[in-house]
From Swiss-Prot:
TFIIB-type zinc-finger residues: 39-70
Keywords for the protein's UniProt record, in alphabetical order: Metal-binding, Repeat, Transcription, Transcription regulation, Zinc, Zinc-finger
An example molecular function term from Gene Ontology annotations: DNA-binding transcription factor activity
Swiss-Prot/TrEMBL Sequence repeat ranges: 156-239, 250-331
Role of this protein: Stabilizes TBP binding to an archaeal box-A promoter. Also responsible for recruiting RNA polymerase II to the pre-initiation complex (DNA-TBP-TFIIB).
Organism: Methanococcus maripaludis (strain C6 / ATCC BAA-1332)
UniProt cross-references to NCBIfam families, sorted A to Z: PRK00423.1 (NF001658)
InterPro entries membership: Cyclin-like_dom (IPR013763), Cyclin-like_sf (IPR036915), TFIIB (IPR000812), TFIIB_arc (IPR023484), TFIIB_CS (IPR023486), TFIIB_cyclin (IPR013150), Znf_TFIIB (IPR013137)
Protein name stated in the entry: Transcription initiation factor IIB
Gene3D superfamilies named in the record: 1.10.472.170, Cyclin-like
Record-linked Pfam families: TFIIB, Zn_Ribbon_TF
Gene: tfb
GO biological process terms on file: transcription preinitiation complex assembly
Matches recorded under SMART domains: CYCLIN
GO cellular component: transcription preinitiation complex
């Protein structure tokens, strides 16, 4: 590989020099190479922003033309190797990463519940009583005032609801950020902590395109559906949260999975919904009902039929709703369904 030294004259940061080398773009088509996108750099040769970091070759490379922007990068990872989770936990010398789902963002000190010293040896009996008192006071000072206690309770409630709904980590983090924003603006006053937490989680679900209905959240949150909806509209307005209407397509994978339908049915249902959206058949209608009708039609067309009752129970709608949406979709999309 030929290496040339080129000075970048026209750049936003003057007096900055970048060593360039030309690599073949096809060298980075191998899926076994660990790559990471670099958003801040711009290729000085072709002007592309598709810059990747190749940890295997220790280089920063333009994905379009193969220009090597930097080489011989330092490895900032740990010096030890771990081959399973247990080894990783034992050899790690740092705590968990910062998270918004804990009231102190996970930055406070925690005294381990195991009565062992740093060498793994058991602590003597006369030291255990002292360690117990230290552990108790450490838990107390982590939550120093009423606002922190309320935040700790709200985030634990938020985590409980998310766990019951099976929501991923990014949704929980998003909901925690929204709740903290509501606390900073004083939107909690006069409202229940559980209601605001449930509303923040509902907004996070829609923002992350992992939709859950108000009924599903109300069922596990011990808060009335109307209160969640009212609180959601309030915090959305005050926090300037702009969310597009929920797309029925987002419900299809979950409904199809719960009905144990094959991938062909899911793909067919998504295709039906996309055509319906182009003709405006999904606007002004409940997304769950439209998604349920599309899944029902797709299951019949693919020969893996599910009854309207089964689909309605999974989607949380009535059989009448499915029949109405079914009639609209089949008529306007010219779908011939043989029952």
């Amino acid at each position: 590989m030929k290496v040339e030294a080129i000075t970048k004259e026209e750049t936003k940061k003057p007096e900055r020099k970048i060593k360039l080398a030309i690599a073949k773009p096809e060298d980075y088509s191998n899926k076994n190479v660990i790559l990471e996108k670099e958003e801040e750099l711009i290729c000085p040769v072709c002007g592309s922003k598709n810059i990747i970091k190749d940890y295997e070759r220790a280089e920063i490379v333009c994905e379009m033309c193969g220009c090597v922007l930097q080489q011989n990068l330092f490895d900032v990872g740990p010096e030890w190797r771990a081959f399973d989770h247990e080894q990783r936990v034992k050899r790690s010398r740092v705590g968990a990463p910062m998270t918004y789902t804990i009231h102190d963002k996970g930055l406070s000190t925690v005294i381990d519940w195991r009565n062992k010293d740093s060498y793994g040896k058991d602590i003597s009996a006369d030291k255990r009583a002292q360690l117990y008192r230290l552990r108790k006071w450490q838990r107390r000072i982590r939550v120093s005032d009423a606002s922190e206690r309320n935040l700790a309770f709200a985030l634990s409630e938020l985590d409980r609801i998310a766990s019951k709904l099976g929501l991923p980590r990014n949704v929980r983090e998003n909901a925690a950020v929204l709740y903290r924003g509501a606390v900073e603006k004083g939107l909690i006053r006069g409202r229940s902590i559980e209601g605001v937490a449930a509303a923040a989680l509902y907004a996070a679900c829609r923002r992350c395109k992992v939709p859950r209905t108000l009924d599903e959240i109300a069922e596990v949150s011990r808060v009335d559906r109307k209160e969640i909806g009212r609180t959601y509209r309030f915090i959305s307005r005050e926090l300037n949260i702009r969310l597009a209407p929920t797309n029925p397509v987002d419900y299809v994978p979950r409904f199809a999975s719960e009905l144990k339908l094959p991938g062909e049915v899911e793909s067919k249902a998504i295709s039906i919904l996309q055509k319906a959206g182009e003709k405006g058949l999904t606007s002004g209608r409940g997304p769950t009902g439209v998604a349920a009708a599309a899944i029902y039609i797709a299951s019949v067309l693919q020969g893996t039929r599910r009854t309207q009752r089964e689909v309605a129970d999974v989607a949380g709608v009535t059989e009448v709703t499915i029949r109405n949406r079914y009639k609209e979709l089949t008529e306007h999309l010219d779908i011939d369904v043989t029952l």
